[in-house]
C-alpha cells in the first residue's frame, strides 16, 4: 500500500465495502456522538467520513485530534445505514472504520475556521492565505482558473496559434501606468523594468515573421487597486496576428471567449459571437455612460435637449444656452413611484451632483398623468413628447442629467446600472458581450488647448496619414475593447506599423521624432525593415475567472493576491532591503517625511 493513501477522499463508494484503505487529509471537523467519534476527513478532492468506537486500539489517539490536523488513517470501508446516507457528497454511502492513525502535521489554534461559512476580515484572510485557500469555495475558484486557462490554450492551439514566451525583465516603456523598476547590479545607476504587457515584443514577433502568437502572460503595473484590478500584477491571454483586419481579430478571439464562457458559465446564457454588437465609443458613452456597458440591462439613455430648450425649467434651459451642453434622459421602466425617484435623486447627490431631475407617470382621475417637479415646470405638451420619445407609460419614470457630457456621463452610467439592478431589469443569468470600436485617438485639454492622446497611440489611425492631416479630434483609431457585464474583458488594436505615420501621430501630441525613437527605439527601428500589417488583443484572465465564479472582488480568484495597499501580508512584502544589497546595487534609501 502507498505510504500515504490508496484513495482520495472523494473516491470511495459502495463498491469498496469490505476493503482496507488508506486515506490522508485534513480534519475538517470532529463530532462525538455518545462515545463514537466521527471525523470528516478532507483533501483537495472531497470529504470522507471516518469513525472510531471505544473498542478501537487507537481510540485514545483519535480523541486528541483537532480541526485542521493533517492525518493518515487506515481502516475498513463499511456501508452506512440507509437513514444515514448523505446524498450531497460522492462518498455519502460509506464510512471508514479507523484501525490505525498517524498524525502527519499538528495545527495551532486557527485564526480562521476552514469549515463553515463564517466571514473573516480580508486582512486575516490574506495574512493566513494558506488556510483561507483550504476553504471549499477558494479551492473551487482556483480549479476553475486552472481549467479555464487549459481550455483557452486548447482553443488557441486549435486555431493554429503557437505559444511563445516574452521577457520578464526589459526596458522601461510607459504604457499608461507606472513601471516596477529593477536596479541593475552590472550597470550601476541603470534600471530594468517589469513589463506592463508584452506589447512591443509581440509586435516584434510579427516583424520577425511569426504569424500567430499567444501567451498566458504576466503583466506588472504599479496601479491603484480596485475591486476588479490587482495593484501589482495580473495575467492576460495575449495574442497577435499578421496580415489581419479588425474583423479578423474579432472572428478569432470571439469564439475562444464565447466557448470558455459556455464551458464554465454553469448554464448562464452566452450570446453567439456573431450576435455581439459593435458599438462606437461615442454611442457607448451616449447610450450607457460607459465604454464598458452592461448590456444585461436594457436601459438606453437618450438626448432630450430639445424638450427643455426654452422651457419653464430654468436650470436646464439656461444650461442649454452654453456651448457643448445637452440634457440626457435615463428611462426607468416600472420605476414610477415618488419613493424610488427620491432614492435615485439621493444617489446622484452622493455622487457629487446637485441632484437628478425626474418625471414619473401614474394613473390619474382623467387617465395617465405625469408627476414630479420637472413635469410641472415644462408643462404637459413637452412632458408627453418626452414620454413618447422614451417609449414609457403608466408606472414608468425617467431621470435627467445635464451639462457638458464629460461632467455627468460617468454618473449617468452608474445611475443606469443602479436603476437596472433595483428594478430587476438586469438579467443575472446572462453574459452579454459587446465590441466597443472607433475610439478617438486624441483629446483637447479645455484649459490649455493642448492636443494629447486620449487612447492607444500605437493603433493605426482609420484613414492612415490622410486622417492625421485633418482635424486631430476627428481621428479614430483601429482600436477595440470587448465589454462583458460591465467589465472591460478584452482590449486590442490594429497596430500602426509604418514609422512615418507613427512619427506623425506622436508629433500631433507634441512628441518629437527623437523622443519617440528614445522611448520606443527597438520597435521603431524594426518597423524600418519590412513590418507586416498586424493586430491583436489581450483578454484579462483574472476578470474572466471573476465573472465565471460570480465573484465581486478579483482577489477571490487570485491564489496569493496583494491587499488594497499593495502589500503581501503573508510574505511581509514590500520589505526593507539589507544594507549589503543596497551597497551591491549602488543605491541609497532617502528617508521620507511622514
UniProtKB/Swiss-Prot annotation:
Please give the coiled-coil regions recorded for this protein: none
Annotated Gene Ontology cellular component terms: cytoplasm
Q: Which GO terms describe its biological process?
A: aspartyl-tRNA aminoacylation
Annotated positions for site Important for tRNA non-discrimination: 33
> Could you say which EC number(s) this protein's record lists?
6.1.1.23
PROSITE patterns in the cross-refs: AA_TRNA_LIGASE_II (PS50862)
One Gene Ontology molecular-function label: aspartate-tRNA(Asn) ligase activity
Top-tier EC class: ligase
Has keyword RNA-binding?
Answer: no
Segments carrying the region annotation (Aspartate) are 199-202
Which positions in this protein are listed as binding ATP? 221-223, 488, 540-543
Entry's localization field: Cytoplasm
Cite the HAMAP family for this sequence: Asp_tRNA_synth_type1
The free-text function statement in the UniProt record for this protein reads:
Aspartyl-tRNA synthetase with relaxed tRNA specificity since it is able to aspartylate not only its cognate tRNA(Asp) but also tRNA(Asn). Reaction proceeds in two steps: L-aspartate is first activated by ATP to form Asp-AMP and then transferred to the acceptor end of tRNA(Asp/Asn).
Its name, as the record gives it, is Aspartate--tRNA(Asp/Asn) ligase
* Provenance organism: Ruegeria sp. (strain TM1040) (Silicibacter sp.)
Amino acid at each position: 500500500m502507498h505510504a500515504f493513501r490508496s484513495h482520495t477522499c472523494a473516491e470511495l463508494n459502495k463498491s469498496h465495502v469490505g476493503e482496507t484503505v488508506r486515506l490522508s487529509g485534513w480534519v475538517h471537523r470532529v463530532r462525538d456522538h455518545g462515545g463514537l467519534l466521527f471525523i470528516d476527513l478532507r483533501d483537495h478532492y472531497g470529504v470522507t467520513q471516518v469513525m472510531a468506537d471505544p473498542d478501537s486500539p487507537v481510540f485514545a489517539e483519535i480523541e486528541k485530534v483537532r480541526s485542521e490536523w493533517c492525518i493518515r488513517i487506515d481502516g475498513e470501508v463499511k456501508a452506512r445505514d440507509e437513514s444515514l446516507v448523505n446524498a450531497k457528497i460522492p462518498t455519502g454511502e460509506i464510512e471508514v472504520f479507523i484501525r490505525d492513525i498517524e498524525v502527519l502535521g499538528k495545527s495551532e489554534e486557527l485564526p480562521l475556521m476552514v469549515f463553515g461559512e463564517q466571514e473573516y476580515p480580508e486582512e486575516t484572510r490574506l495574512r493566513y492565505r494558506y488556510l483561507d485557500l483550504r476553504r471549499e469555495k477558494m479551492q473551487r475558484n482556483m480549479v476553475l482558473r486552472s481549467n479555464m486557462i487549459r481550455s483557452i490554450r486548447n482553443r488557441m492551439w486549435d486555431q493554429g496559434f503557437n505559444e511563445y514566451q516574452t521577457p520578464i525583465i526589459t526596458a522601461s516603456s510607459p504604457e499608461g501606468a507606472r513601471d516596477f523598476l529593477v536596479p541593475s547590479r552590472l550597470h550601476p545607476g541603470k534600471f530594468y523594468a517589469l513589463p506592463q504587457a508584452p506589447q512591443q515584443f509581440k509586435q516584434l514577433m510579427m516583424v520577425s515573421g511569426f504569424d500567430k502568437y499567444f501567451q498566458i502572460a504576466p503583466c506588472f503595473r504599479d496601479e491603484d487597486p480596485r475591486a476588479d484590478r490587482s495593484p501589482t500584477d495580473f495575467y492576460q491571454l495575449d495574442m497577435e496576428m499578421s496580415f489581419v483586419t479588425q474583423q479578423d481579430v474579432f472572428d478569432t478571439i470571439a469564439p475562444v471567449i464565447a466557448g470558455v464562457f459556455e464551458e464554465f458559465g454553469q448554464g448562464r446564457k452566452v450570446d453567439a459571437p456573431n450576435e455581439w454588437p459593435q458599438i462606437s465609443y461615442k454611442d457607448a458613452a451616449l447610450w450607457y455612460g460607459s465604454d464598458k456597458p452592461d448590456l444585461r440591462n436594457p436601459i438606453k439613455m437618450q438626448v432630450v435637449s430639445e424638450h427643455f430648450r426654452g422651457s419653464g425649467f430654468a436650470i436646464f434651459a439656461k444650461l442649454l444656452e452654453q456651448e457643448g451642453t445637452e440634457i440626457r434622459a435615463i428611462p426607468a421602466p416600472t420605476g414610477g413611484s415618488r419613493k424610488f425617484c427620491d432614492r435615485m435623486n439621493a444617489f446622484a447627490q452622493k455622487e457629487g451632483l446637485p441632484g437628478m431631475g425626474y418625471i414619473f407617470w401614474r394613473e390619474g382621475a382623467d387617465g395617465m398623468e405625469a408627476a414630479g417637479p420637472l413635469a410641472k415646470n415644462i408643462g404637459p405638451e413637452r412632458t408627453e413628447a418626452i414620454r413618447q420619445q422614451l417609449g414609457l407609460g403608466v408606472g414608468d419614470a425617467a431621470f435627467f442629467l445635464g451639462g457638458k457630457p464629460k461632467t455627468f456621463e460617468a454618473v449617468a452610467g452608474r445611475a443606469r446600472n443602479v436603476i437596472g439592478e433595483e428594478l430587476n431589469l438586469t438579467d443575472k443569468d446572462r453574459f452579454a458581450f459587446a465590441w466597443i470600436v472607433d475610439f478617438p485617438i486624441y483629446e483637447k485639454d479645455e484649459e490649455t488647448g493642448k492636443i494629447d492622446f486620449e487612447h492607444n497611440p500605437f493603433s493605426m489611425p482609420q484613414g492612415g496619414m490622410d486622417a492625421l492631416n485633418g482635424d486631430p479630434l476627428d481621428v479614430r483609431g483601429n482600436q477595440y475593447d470587448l465589454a462583458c457585464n460591465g467589465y472591460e474583458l478584452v482590449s486590442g488594436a490594429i497596430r500602426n506599423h509604418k514609422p512615418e505615420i507613427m512619427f506623425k501621430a506622436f508629433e500631433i501630441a507634441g512628441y518629437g521624432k527623437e523622443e519617440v525613437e528614445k522611448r520606443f527605439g527597438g520597435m521603431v527601428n524594426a518597423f524600418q525593415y519590412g513590418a507586416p500589417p498586424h493586430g491583436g488583443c489581450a483578454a484579462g484572465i483574472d476578470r474572466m475567472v471573476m465573472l465565471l465564479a460570480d465573484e465581486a472582488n478579483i482577489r477571490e480568484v487570485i491564489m496569493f493576491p496583494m491587499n488594497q495597499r499593495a502589500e503581501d501580508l503573508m510574505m511581509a512584502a514590500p520589505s526593507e532591503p539589507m544594507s549589503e544589497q543596497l551597497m551591491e546595487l549602488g543605491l541609497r534609501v532617502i528617508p521620507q517625511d511622514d
